[in-house]
């Protein structure tokens, strides 16, 4: 614990805030060729450099689809591809948002379905906005 004299001389310093999705807080200045830390953006655009599957941590078992994405701020991150089936491949342009996948270490971002080169999930009826699925045709009413 500091003494009164130390507090008078130096004061208290606040701890640096740690961000859960740091890549969204950096922006690239093409004129100065520098990356700057800023207020952040809700989404970022990027290009897939690798699309693959990986296995989750201990109690779970699956083949989770992930993509390595090079963002517009020149950072490279690993993002999760939600939903069943996808059309992503190398050089696909995608939009990412923050949000980790608890059982995949190092995956802190999600790819937004239904935007840019990412197709929405086919035949999805519930929670469609999360997966970029269009409203399906309503079933015709039965006649008596």
UniProtKB/Swiss-Prot annotation:
Superkingdom assignment: Bacteria
Output the Pfam families linked to this UniProt entry. Ribosom_S12_S23 (PF00164)
Q: Which InterPro entries match?
A: NA-bd_OB-fold, Ribosomal_uS12, Ribosomal_uS12_bac
Query: In the UniProt record, which is one GO cellular component term?
Result: small ribosomal subunit
| Example GO molecular function | structural constituent of ribosome
Where is the segment annotated Disordered? 125-144
Record-listed 3-methylthioaspartic acid modification sites: 103
Q: According to the UniProt entry, which residue ranges have a biased composition of type Basic residues? A: 131-144
Offer one example of a GO biological process linked to this entry: translation
Q: Which UniProt keywords apply?
A: Methylation, Ribonucleoprotein, Ribosomal protein, RNA-binding, rRNA-binding, tRNA-binding
Disulfide-bonded cysteines: none
Q: Which PANTHER family match?
A: 30S RIBOSOMAL PROTEIN S12 FAMILY MEMBER (PTHR11652)
Which family does the entry's similarity section mention?
Belongs to the universal ribosomal protein uS12 family.
What the protein does?
With S4 and S5 plays an important role in translational accuracy.
- Subunit details: Part of the 30S ribosomal subunit. Contacts proteins S8 and S17. May interact with IF1 in the 30S initiation complex.
Q: Which NCBIfam families match?
A: rpsL_bact
| Name under which the protein is recorded | Small ribosomal subunit protein uS12
């Amino acid at each position: 614990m500091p003494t009164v004299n130390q507090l008078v001389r130096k004061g208290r310093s606040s701890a640096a805030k740690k961000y859960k999705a740091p890549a969204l807080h950096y922006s690239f200045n093409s004129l100065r060729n520098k990356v700057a830390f800023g207020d952040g953006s809700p989404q970022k655009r990027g290009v897939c450099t690798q699309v693959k599957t990986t296995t989750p941590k201990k109690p779970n078992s699956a083949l989770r689809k992930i993509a390595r994405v090079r963002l517009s701020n020149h950072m490279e991150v690993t993002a999760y591809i939600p939903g069943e089936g996808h059309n992503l491949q190398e050089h696909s342009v995608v939009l990412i948002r923050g949000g980790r996948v608890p059982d995949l270490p190092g995956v802190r971002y999600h790819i937004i379905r239904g935007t840019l080169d990412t197709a929405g999930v086919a035949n999805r009826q519930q929670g469609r906005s999360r997966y970029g699925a269009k409203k399906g045709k309503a079933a015709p009413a039965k006649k008596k």
